[in-house]
Regions:
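Conserved N-terminal structural module of periplasmic/extracytoplasmic solute-binding proteins
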Residues: 3-5, 10-138, 157, 381, ...
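Hinge/lid segment of periplasmic solute-binding proteins
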Residues: 40-41, 46-49, 119, 132-188, ...
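Beta->alpha turn/N-cap motifs
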Residues: 62-64, 132-136, 236-238, 287, ...
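Extracytoplasmic/periplasmic substrate-binding proteins
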Residues: 75-76, 265-368
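A local structural motif
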Residues: 84-103, 122, 203-208, 271-285, ...
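Short helices/loops that flank or line small-molecule/ion binding pockets
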Residues: 108-126, 130, 138, 143, ...
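Helix-loop-helix "hinge/cap" segment bordering the ligand-binding cleft or interdomain interface
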Residues: 150-159, 168-239, 251-284, 358-364, ...
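Long, aromatic- and glycine/proline-rich binding clefts that accommodate carbohydrate-like moieties
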Residues: 332-336, 384-444, 448, 476-481
Length: 481
């Protein structure tokens, strides 16, 4: 089966109109949904690369997380520009960073436009590496714009052997692996120790887990927390991933969107929590949500995966941010007042994959970056020890899990041990190319229902309208009976 056409590649992100997509691919009239399988990766782009390689490495991403990992842990880094726009390597290669925020599909839209122009771009302007997320990984890896990490770039089975299998599966099509990552992203429930002690009489992670081990128990604790004037969750979106990661089938079957019953359980719970005052009516990433994680917050806990602990929650917990001279230490805000437990269901959230772009003239450098930053056990272990990120090397993580490692931010808890168990339960078999757009549209459509501005049927209709505007090739929506 052929890979995603240029037309459907664009439609998968809702990036352009049909007419613009037709122009981009010479008038193709195909409107089928992206295929779930593809032919083996083309090695033509790799064979076109000059043996000597280029002297500019263009990397595209949506925030500075990978940029920080690269600058801090890639051994070939020689110099970093003051404004961080470029990084110079030991061999003189200049890494140019292009960072476009994720909001409203902005990153994908700009990336898609650049990839469509890759063939005609000057060598030093071509994208060499770009980053993708789990929610839309299949859109890119099931296309001609990404190189096979083994056949085209040169990584070996031995290089990749230590990685979690799911991190390889999600970026593989017909046995062709098209990306690699330094992180695994199992999810846990991060709770305030002081609030847990007030509500449950204990802050011990093992004991707290017994109170939160299924949704009925979780709801009971929400009622107990409310009785003491706490919110169980901050807002509408907090529990969403825990439900959406436990669905029975992908969002899309052919050209039909099928809403899973488990997604509707999230709707029912969130409506109940909103009506009963168990949440603070915040939205993911808004100022209220961030404040609820800090010193003035009165929220029991937050569903977070690995990156969220060190990349978001820690920063939000501080009274004085690091940028303003604050230190990451007990005494600054509520640093040390969080802990984690498994929560009611296993889930994952996010994950970032490194892809080599077809047409790059820097194959050897891409290979070295991938080897060092995603396959090197010592580097993976050091990243975790330094940053608390959970890295993609099973042996290294098991070693830390079994050690006396502890997180001061989490009150001395070894959260890596819990993440190591949760990582074994990750199932990405239902991931698809439309996930980001459908998840966002669904959450947005139902917020008016949660707040009482529309009824449930209207929220459903609004979701259908939104996704058909975003993805014209999707023809029907089926709701659970």
């Amino acid at each position: 089966m052929k890979k995603i056409s240029r037309r459907n590649f664009l439609l998968a992100s809702g990036a352009v109109t049909i007419s613009a997509a037709l122009t981009a691919c010479g008038g193709s009239s195909s409107s089928t949904a992206p295929a779930s399988s593809a032919a083996p990766a083309s090695s033509a782009a790799a064979s076109e690369a000059p043996a000597a390689g280029g002297k500019v490495l263009n990397i595209w991403c949506w925030n500075d997380e990978f940029q920080s990992r690269f600058n801090d842990y890639y051994p070939e880094v020689k110099e970093i520009a003051a404004d961080k726009s470029t990084t110079t390597l030991n061999d003189g290669t200049v890494v140019k960073w292009t960072i476009n925020a994720n909001e409203n599909n902005n990153y994908q839209n700009k990336l898609d436009e650049a990839l469509l122009s890759q063939d005609s771009a000057a060598d030093d302007d071509k994208i060499d590496i770009f980053l993708i997320e789990a929610d839309y990984a299949l859109k890119y890896v099931d296309s001609d714009y990404v190189l096979d990490v083994k056949a085209d770039i040169g990584l070996t089975d031995s290089d990749l052997a230590g990685q979690y299998q799911y991190t390889k599966d999600i970026v593989s099509v017909d046995g062709s692996q098209r990306g690699t990552t330094w992180q695994a992203t199992p999810g846990l429930f991060a709770y305030r120790r002081s609030i847990a002690k007030d509500v449950l009489g204990t802050d011990d992670p093992t004991e707290v887990q017994t109170y939160l081990s299924d949704w009925d128990k979780f709801n009971d604790v929400a009622a107990q927390a409310a009785a003491k004037d706490y919110k169980m969750l901050s807002g509408f979106d907090d529990a969403y991933r825990t439900f959406s990661n436990n669905v029975a089938a992908p969002w899309v079957d052919g050209t039909t969107v099928k809403v899973d019953p488990n997604i509707m359980k999230w709707v029912d719970q969130t409506k109940e929590y909103t009506d009963k005052g168990y949440n603070n009516k915040s939205s993911l990433w808004d100022s209220q949500w961030a404040a609820d994680q800090g010193p003035t917050g009165k929220v029991f806990g937050f569903f977070y995966s690995t990156w969220g602990i060190n990349f978001t929650l820690l920063g939000n917990s501080l009274e004085t941010p690091v940028a303003e001279g604050g230190k990451e230490e007990v005494g600054n805000g509520i640093y040390g007042d969080y802990a984690v437990c498994e929560g009611p269901q296993p889930y994952y959230w996010g994950g970032t994959w490194i892809c080599g772009a077809a047409g790059s003239d820097n194959i050897e450098t891409i290979k070295d970056v991938m080897q060092k930053l995603t396959c090197d056990e010592a580097i993976m272990k050091q990243i975790t020890m330094d940053t608390q990120d959970y890295t993609n090397n099973e042996k290294a993580m098991e070693e830390i899990a079994a050690s006396d490692y502890s997180s001061a931010f989490l009150g001395g808890q070894n959260h890596i041990a819990l993440f190591a168990e949760a990582a074994k339960k990750i199932d990405m078999s239902n991931a698809g190319p439309y996930d980001q757009g459908l998840n966002e549209s669904f959450q947005n459509a139902f917020k008016d229902y949660f707040t009482g501005n529309v009824d449930e049927d209207t929220a459903k209709a609004n979701f259908e309208t939104a996704i058909k505007e975003k993805y014209p090739e999707l023809t029907d929506v089926v709701w659970p009976a």
